[in-house]
Each structure stands twice: as C-alpha cells, then as structure tokens.
Amino acid sequence: VSDTKKASDVFIECLEAEGCEYIFGVPGEENLDFLDSLGKSDKIKLILTRHEQGAGFMAATYGRHTGKTGVCVATLGPGATNFVTSAAYAQLGGMPMLMITGQKPIKKSKQGRFQIVDIVSLMEPVTKYSIQIAAGDNIPSRVREAYRLAEEEKPGATLIELPEDIAEEPTTDWKPLPKSVARRPSAEPKAVRAAVEAIEKAKSPIIVIGAGANRKMAGRMLEQLVEKTGIPFLTTQMGKGVIDERHPKFVGCAALSAGDFVHRAVEASDCIINVGHDVIEKPPFFMQDNGVTVIHVSTKTAEVDPVYFPQIEVIGDIGNAIWQIKEDVSPNRDWNFDHILAYHQAELEHTGKLADDARFPIFPPHLVKQVRECMPRDGIICLDNGVYKIWFARGYTAYLPNTVLLDNALATMGAGLPSAMMSAMLYPDRKVMAICGDGGFMMNSQEMETAGRLGLNLTVLILRDDAYGMIRWKQANMGFADFGLTYGNPDYVKYAESYGAHGHRVESS
C-alpha cells in the first residue's frame, strides 16, 4: 500500500509546495494529526501563540509584508470563532491569509454536538473562500485554490476546515498541484490614451494613492510618473509610504477631517488620478458634478457610489497601467501646482508649531516627531487603533512602503502588538515599534510572552489615558456627557518585567 499517504501529511506537503514558512496558532485535539505531520516538516515552523486572534493578526501581517499567504491554525468551535476578527482584518485590509481549523469527525459518530459550530458558514461573509475537506483526495486542489484566491487582487482571507477523521485517512491522490504562472492583464491602450488626454488637458492634476497601490511594483512606477510629470500626490492612510513622503511633490495623508489642508489641496485640482482606490477607505474627496475629472486606475472597475463616479477607468495591473500612462504622457507647460502645494506648506507651518510643544503629559504631535527622529529610515511602526493613529497617519513621515502599518479598513483594536511581532520576525535587523493605546494593548497583551519566547527585537510604546479615548473624544464632540468609557490599568513597568521585558515609564516630554 506504498502509494497511499496520510491526509494530514499531504496537507503539509501542499503547504510546503506553496512556499509556506510559518504556521501561527493554537492547536487543539482535533488538529493533532495535522500537528504531528507539521512536526515532521523541516520547511515549516510552528509559532505557538497565546490566543488565536494574535495568530491570525500575525498571519495576515505576514501576507501584508510579503504578498504571500500567511497561514494560521486553530481547533474547532471556540478556537475557530476566535479567528473571526482576524479574518475580517485580512479580508477588509487586503491581506492574503489561510486559516486551517479542526472539526469533529464527519463520517462517524460525533459524540453529540459538543463544541460543534458551523465554522464554514460562519466565515463565509469575511472570507473569499470557506470550505470543508470531505475527502483527503481533495486536499491538493483545495489548498491550491485557497492560495490562489487569497493572493489574487484584492487579496483576503480563506478558510479550510479539516475534520479529524479526514486528517487521519489514507489518500491516493497526494501530489501537490503546481502553481500556474498567471500574469495580471494589462490596461487597454484606448483607456490609457483617454486618461493621458485628460491629464494633459487639465490645469492642475493631482495623484491620490490608495490601498491598492501599496503593492510591490506600483510604488516604483508611481515615483517615476511623479518624477517625469511633476504632478503632486497625496495618499490615503492605507497608501502611506508608497512614495517617500519627503518628496517635494508630497501633499499629505488624508486622515479623518474633511476641510483640512489635504482636502483643500484636492479641491484645488481639476483632474484627480485616483490610483488603487479601495472603497474600504472613503476617497479623500467627494465627487460632485462640477467639471472635475476623476480617473480610476485599479485592478477592478469602480463600485457604484453616489460620491464616486469616475469618468475614465483604466483597469488592469496597477503598476503596468501607471507605466503605460508615464510612457505616453507629455508634461504640459501650462500646468500650475502652486495652489495645491501652498496648502501643504501651510500644513507644515501649522503642524511645526504643534510638534515643538513639549508640554507634559505629552502632546501627540510632539510624540510623533520624537518617534520619527529616533526611528531609522527602514524602521517599522505598527499602530494599534485609537486617536494617536490619526496623528501618526498625518504627521509621521514615511520613507519606505510598509514602514507604517496601520489598519484603516476593519480598524480593529488589538492588532498593534501582533503586527509588530510579525514585522520583527520577518525583518530581524530592522527597528520595529508597536504603538498602542492602553485599550488596544490589553486586548492582546498576552502575546508579550510569545514575543519573549521568540526572542523578538521590538519596542512597545503604550499611550495611556485610562480610557477608550477615541470614543470618549467623539462622545465629547457630539455633546454627550462623559460616561462609561474609563477604566484602570496595571503597572505597565512591572507588567513588562513579568514577561521578561524591560519596562520604562516616561516621566517628562
């Protein structure tokens, strides 16, 4: 019977064939065959975490950094339900991830309904693909399909449920399916020509860089387009760092407030080149029928929206489309960017004063400046969610792509520390800082043990206000009484030391 293989062994071989390096998670009884097969692999390392959510955030961040699918594992029932937030984080944020979950036997007695939840159905709204393996022979095609869908634009989350009895059964069809080399389609030349004509005809074009442009090649092509044409650019929060923000044509990052400097700069333009727009982030402009041309450059056509109806769409691989536009466009001598760039100048003068305000307790713009000064060029900051995220999105100058990891999609709390841990694992020679509020940090602070066990080189900055500050701020803004949002905190210095980390309390600015 030498031509059969145990199904869980086949699963691991398929993951190896896909180039899987790590599996993050908390295995349970229903994963023990899978765990045994994983233990025999010399290519894949198990990273054991203290909560499934931390594992899911790490897997998603692996996908965000590398473009390859991050893999995580959990048991049935409560293990798998703990992945729901991680799945939504990856799905909305465009990060390729595969979750592998256990389940009770499906062919023989389940011993009642203990711990059984229909995880495949539960995950459908927050994944691109959610499937149960009902026969071991299906594993190679299911794994290949999960990877294909996770990584295809727009990337996202996938789930494969591997029941206990299927994991241990012998399979005959066990060869991993090879990846096909699929090139993404190029934009149609007529669409490119229409876009170029509109850009050349405009008086003050501007480029908006969104989440979809934050992929490997698009950044280089965008920089070349800006160099050739001199057209100013701004980013959304998820597009931050695609081009070095010290560039003289950088206008800012659109975060939160309409009517501010960045939005005024966009309003001064008559042609908006919107690159990699993702509806998850509202565009930093609201279209009116006022003669402003909007060009949508993306892998997919624009979703219908009363405030977003681009007149010209250039659909195809984004990097390639930008290259085609750059090759075709002739810079127009009559273009005038003074008005647009003046808003950026005004913003710099405005924030410069704030950043030098050394009051204590520390003032957020001052903190942003201090962090930027101490982080090297390729240093990575990983933001949890709170008011400080807006300050950093707007005020922290990103020099390289993926050096400011923030989540403006699901915008969950609790991902700051796990995303920093993943960054430190992938880039052990780079400085990594997790920047968390006290609320977000405590949601996954147990992963400090994991970070210590893995010997990760990272710093955690906790901004403590003893409250869910973002909501408290909005509560005050909306005229409500201050109620229901404050709490106490542990002594964070002792807390850090209890995990074997160094703890410091900042006593002055």
Can you say where each PLM-predicted feature lies in the sequence?
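Thiamine diphosphate
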Residues: 100, 108-115, 305-307, 313-315, ...
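Glycine-rich, acidic loop regions that bind phosphate or pyrophosphate groups
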Residues: 101-142, 239-340
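Active-site nucleophile and cofactor-binding loops and adjacent substrate-binding regions
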Residues: 26-28, 46-57, 72-79, 134-135, ...
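Active-site diphosphate/adenylate-binding microenvironment
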Residues: 8-11, 16-18, 34-41, 345-429
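Glycine-rich, anion-gripping cofactor-binding loops and their flanking helix/strand elements
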Residues: 64, 211-295, 399-421, 425-430, ...
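Structural signature of the thiamine diphosphate
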Residues: 21-22, 60, 64-74, 78-101, ...
